[in-house]
Regions:
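Amidase signature
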Residues: 1-176, 184, 223-240
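A generic structural motif
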Residues: 14-15, 209-213
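Active-site-proximal beta-strand/loop segments in catalytic clefts of secreted hydrolases
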Residues: 144-145, 193-195
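AMP-binding (ANL) adenylation modules
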Residues: 149, 195-198
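Residue-level signal for well-ordered, solvent-exposed loop/turn and beta-edge residues enriched
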Residues: 166, 199-201
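A short, aliphatic-rich beta-strand micro-motif
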Residues: 188-192
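Short, well-ordered beta-strand elements
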Residues: 201-210, 217-218
Length: 240
């Protein structure tokens, strides 16, 4: 029961371009929360887009990219374009750290060469902004992706991603609202369907909770699932 809960939401986390169908389906979810007795309030998040994107690349490189870089000499033909770029990112960062000088990623305009300590400092700044919000409310809602889908064969480093007629500057990160919460990894996050887009692909929302408090996140997801039991509805099952 989430009656009398306070739920915060942000449609774009402050800087994402959001597809109109994603926005509509997110609003539908917020309306369902109101039907369940929750109070829903919009909040403003002042995160720096460029700082987050730079940090995300560097942070991921420190976490796992070096292991991919080690595989490239013998297994490059088995890796996706994305995996190869991640491995290349690791080698650029290692070079930048040795030279103690930032190097700009040629295809993305990302500044590489942040230490893991510097990445964690940015994550700390992010939490200074978001922490007071999540502690004031019982839960936080935002879209999972800003578009219903990208093409299955998209090359994230060469192809364009257009949302609402606007080409977004970061075709790899500019449509996924997940990565900020990957950097704030102490926060439990559950993604659930929010509805269908006109192309038949489901859209989603993220339910974010307080640090290490998983149960309230599942409570919100469970209550919404009872209103729309996706797994029982034939219209959402593939015709195979």
């Amino acid at each position: 029961n989430i009656k009398n809960w306070k739920v915060a939401y942000s449609m774009n986390l402050g800087f994402f371009e959001i597809d109109k169908e994603v926005e509509k389906n997110t609003i539908d979810i917020l309306d369902r929360l109101k039907d369940l007795g929750a109070t829903v309030e919009e909040v403003k998040i002042n995160w720096n887009k460029k700082e987050l994107e730079d940090t995300c690349y560097n942070y991921y490189a420190h976490l796992f990219a070096n292991s991919i870089a080690d595989l490239m000499p013998e297994h490059e033909d088995e890796l996706t374009d994305y995996a190869k770029d991640v491995g290349l990112t690791a080698t650029i960062i290692n070079e930048a750290l040795v030279k103690r000088k930032k190097i700009k990623h040629s295809s993305m305009g990302i500044d590489l060469g942040m230490t893991l300590f510097e990445c964690n400092k940015v994550a700390g700044k992010m939490y200074e902004e978001f922490g007071p919000i999540i502690h004031e409310y019982d839960s936080f809602i935002c879209p999972t992706l800003s578009i219903p889908a990208v093409k299955a064969d998209i090359n994230l480093f060469e192809d364009k991603v257009v949302i609402n007629g606007k080409e977004i500057a970061s075709p790899d990160l500019g449509w996924t609202l997940c990565y900020p919460f990957n950097m704030l990894c102490r926060l439990p996050v559950l993604s659930i369907p929010s509805g269908l887009a006109s192309n038949g692909v489901p859209t989603g929302v993220q339910i974010v909770g307080k640090p290490y408090e998983d149960i309230p996140v599942f409570q919100v997801g469970y209550q919404l699932e009872q209103l729309e039991p996706w797994y029982k509805t034939n219209q959402f099952k593939p015709n195979i």
